[in-house]
């Protein structure tokens, strides 16, 4: 199942020529989701060719305008494009969004908008994966989101099937590998007889704007990718604390403690718009497998077969 991330906006509070306001587009199988929706997100979607038609779920981390103001134009464009399917919007402050949508007359669109509040530990389930909200530490009420794939079936043990159970290669192998029981020579063969231990599904964690927290470390444990706020260098740590953000070094420390496979730094302050290498260098001293998010950067989350 394809699990693909596209960064639509990677700037901090203020957009720049190089970086748009925060937004991440995620495709997981047949689901298309948006995480945050800053100013100009719909145009970024047009450039990236993500499409609007199959976008049914938008997850907002907090209600600072650089993370949600792009919702309004996107919602109206969907209506003008004759959308009829319900749109789900998730946020840590549902009542505020409901009031704004009502004020903008969005109760009269040709489709319904369902706003749901998500608190720490609450989840939204999809086919094969779930999105879990987790508490973050910002200057307003905020959450991050973990995209967690269901555990996968274990690897098929061909040698055991053929030599120990006497099942010849062929269609029966495929059924067992899919988790289906079969009958061979009057005996029922269940998948657990030929499959190894379940394999952990893929996991991507996005903090939104946040200080480094134990909760982030906990939910990001062994994640394939951690996308973490890295607004400033360590020399501006006092300002990071005051404004509810993280330094690149702090993001790397979270990644190291959580034992993630890859760290992606985002929410890059305009101080570093033209050259974010100082942030990258700072983070790599703590956690080597770190990259800086760039607008329109896409990557596929692959299976770890180790």
Curated annotation (Swiss-Prot):
CDD domains tied to this protein: RNaseZ_ZiPD-like_MBL-fold (cd07717)
InterPro entries associated with the record: Metallo-B-lactamas, RibonucZ/Hydroxyglut_hydro, RNase_Z/BN
UniProt cofactor(s): Zn(2+)
Protein origin, superkingdom: Archaea
Molecular function (Gene Ontology), one example: zinc ion binding
Record: active site: 66
Swiss-Prot/TrEMBL keywords: Endonuclease, Hydrolase, Metal-binding, Nuclease, tRNA processing, Zinc
Cofactor, free-text remark: Binds 2 Zn(2+) ions.
Reactions catalysed according to its record: Endonucleolytic cleavage of RNA, removing extra 3' nucleotides from tRNA precursor, generating 3' termini of tRNAs. A 3'-hydroxy group is left at the tRNA terminus and a 5'-phosphoryl group is left at the trailer molecule
Binding site for Zn(2+) 2: 66-67, 209, 267
Binding residue positions for Zn(2+) 1: 62, 64, 138, 209
Record's keyword annotation contains Iron: no
The EC number(s) this enzyme carries: 3.1.26.11
Function: Zinc phosphodiesterase, which displays some tRNA 3'-processing endonuclease activity. Probably involved in tRNA maturation, by removing a 3'-trailer from precursor tRNA.
Quaternary organization: Homodimer.
Protein family per UniProt: Belongs to the RNase Z family.
Entry-linked PANTHER family: ZINC PHOSPHODIESTERASE ELAC PROTEIN 1 (PTHR46018:SF2)
Annotated protein name in UniProt: Ribonuclease Z
